[in-house]
Amino acid sequence: MYRSGNLVKLKLLFWICFAGLNAFALSPAPYLPPLDIFNWWDKAQHAIGFGTLTVLAVLAYPQVSKYRVAVLLLLQGVAIEVLQYVGGYRYGDWQDAVADAVGVLLGLVLVKLIFKRLLY
């Protein structure tokens, strides 16, 4: 299925993206670029980020159920929103958690449609 070197690279890429997404999501708002464009772009960024994490996680950890990956990433998305809400310097938003869930679902669809040959 995979060469072990490729699997290590995928795992490393997943964890780099995971750390980057969390660092960006939990950064104080003054350090973020202003959101001058449409609000839908914020939701799209959530979906793209979590979709990317889903694809990388499923490819990097083929022994883990896709559904377990999905649940763990959904929990992570909710945890980020809770931390933003209680942190006092960001705003937790349930719509962001929904956008995260949409991204996870899109990631699973991408894996099934595009990466099917790698996994089955």
Where are the model-predicted features located?
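"…centered on the first transmembrane helix and the immediately adjacent amphipathic helix/loop
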Residues: 1-57
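Membrane-helix interface segments
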Residues: 8-9, 62-70, 93-94
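Small-polar-interrupted transmembrane alpha-helices in polytopic inner-membrane proteins
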Residues: 15-25, 69-85, 101
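Short helix-capping/hinge motifs at transmembrane helix termini and TM-loop junctions
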Residues: 26-28, 61-62, 88, 115
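Interfacial helix-loop-helix junctions of multi-pass membrane proteins
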Residues: 31-40, 80-102
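Short, conserved structural micro-motifs that define repeat-unit consensus positions
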Residues: 42-55, 73-84, 92
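Membrane-interfacial alpha-helical segments at the cytosolic side of multi-pass membrane proteins
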Residues: 49-63, 104-115
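Short, charged juxtamembrane terminal tails flanking transmembrane helices
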Residues: 116-120
